[in-house]
């Protein structure tokens, strides 16, 4: 049995927990929760019969195998360091934090030193396995075009001074580097960092806000010595958190299952 603790108790954490509780194989179980909003953690713990932790230190000190971060980019550094130092592997959902190269190298070296693992799920895009394999050759171009409903980008756009009520047709709201993209859209474009890490090449990112869109659309283009990789995924937004896709949560659940099962399919 893989014993799991969750950091962050929002919509994604709830999806992960329910999926593992309904798994007939029952090879992984969430045993403890922590959230900066203690009421959220307590509520989810009461619903599942798991432990409610009042601090991250309390969570990582428990008898757990794996910590899953599904909180925010600001929670990543502390979560990873404390998890690794307490002999636990960790899954990072808020992979946008790794756009900070210095932080990525710091955590990479700590995991290497302690003999532990940091896992980054594929998230809401397809083809990451092919991109990882292709990165062993020479990559010459990586781009991501993401189209989302306006309401899914609302908070990030309004923070930049844009009036979302004035967007009446598809509008390019960002075009630039992966580093600038994750800085301006920290809750919306984690997939750009996953793509950049997998390809070992900084992705060019375009974000389109579409008032008529009902899905989150991610188009990937990778060119290199292996040829050309093109993928397009149209994801249903997470029902309780339209900033992200349901597939992002499912990719974490699939990763947890892979870690708990004897056979793993895919790169």
Swiss-Prot record:
Miscellaneous comment text of the record: The iminoaspartate product is unstable in aqueous solution and can decompose to oxaloacetate and ammonia.
Q: Does the keyword Transcription apply?
A: no
Q: Where NAD(+) is bound, by residue?
A: 124, 190
Question: Where does the signal sequence lie?
Answer: none
**Highest taxon in the source lineage:** Archaea
Q: What GO molecular function annotation could you give as one example from this UniProt entry? A: aspartate dehydrogenase activity
What is its EC class?
Answer: oxidoreductase
Q: What does this protein do?
A: Specifically catalyzes the NAD or NADP-dependent dehydrogenation of L-aspartate to iminoaspartate.
* Reactions it catalyzes: L-aspartate + NADP(+) + H2O = oxaloacetate + NH4(+) + NADPH + H(+); L-aspartate + NAD(+) + H2O = oxaloacetate + NH4(+) + NADH + H(+)
GO BP, sorted A to Z? NAD biosynthetic process
Q: Tell me the InterPro entries matching this sequence.
A: Asp/hSer_DH_NAD-bd, Asp_DH, Asp_DH_arc, Asp_DH_prok, L-Asp_DH, NAD(P)-bd_dom_sf
Family label: Belongs to the L-aspartate dehydrogenase family.
Q: Tell me which residues this entry annotates as catalytic.
A: 218
Matching entries from HAMAP family are given as:
NadX
Which key words are in the record?
NAD, NADP, Oxidoreductase, Pyridine nucleotide biosynthesis
Pfam families reported for this sequence: Asp_DH_C, NAD_binding_3
Could you say which EC number(s) this protein's record lists?
Answer: 1.4.1.21
Q: In which pathway does this enzyme or protein participate?
A: Cofactor biosynthesis; NAD(+) biosynthesis; iminoaspartate from L-aspartate (dehydrogenase route): step 1/1
Name the UniProt record assigns to this protein: L-aspartate dehydrogenase
């Amino acid at each position: 049995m893989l014993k799991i603790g969750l950091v962050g108790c929002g919509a994604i954490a709830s999806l992960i927990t329910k999926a593992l509780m309904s798994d007939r194989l029952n090879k992984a179980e969430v045993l403890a929760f922590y959230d900066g909003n203690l009421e959220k953690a307590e509520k989810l713990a009461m619903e599942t019969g798991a432990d409610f932790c009042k601090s991250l230190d309390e969570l990582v000190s428990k008898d757990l195998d794996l910590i899953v971060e599904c909180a925010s980019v600001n929670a990543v550094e502390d979560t990873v360091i404390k998890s690794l130092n307490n002999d636990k592997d960790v899954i990072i959902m808020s992979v946008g934090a790794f756009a900070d190269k210095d932080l990525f190298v710091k955590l990479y070296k700590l995991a290497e030193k302690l003999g532990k693992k940091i896992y980054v799920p594929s998230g809401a895009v397809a083809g990451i396995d092919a991109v990882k394999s292709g990165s062993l050759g020479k990559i010459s171009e990586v781009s991501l075009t993401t189209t989302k409903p306006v309401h899914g980008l609302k908070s990030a756009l309004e923070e930049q001074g844009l009036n979302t009520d004035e967007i009446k047709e598809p509008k390019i709201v960002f075009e630039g580097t992966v580093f600038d993209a994750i800085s301006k859209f920290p809750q919306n474009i984690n997939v750009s960092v996953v793509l950049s890490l997998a390809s070992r090449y900084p992705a060019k990112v375009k974000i389109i806000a579409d008032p008529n869109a009902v899905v989150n659309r991610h188009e990937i283009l990778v060119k290199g010595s292996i040829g050309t990789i093109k993928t397009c995924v149209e994801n249903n937004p997470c029902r309780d958190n339209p900033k992200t896709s349901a597939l992002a949560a499912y990719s974490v659940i699939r990763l947890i299952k892979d870690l708990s099962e004897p056979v793993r399919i895919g790169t």
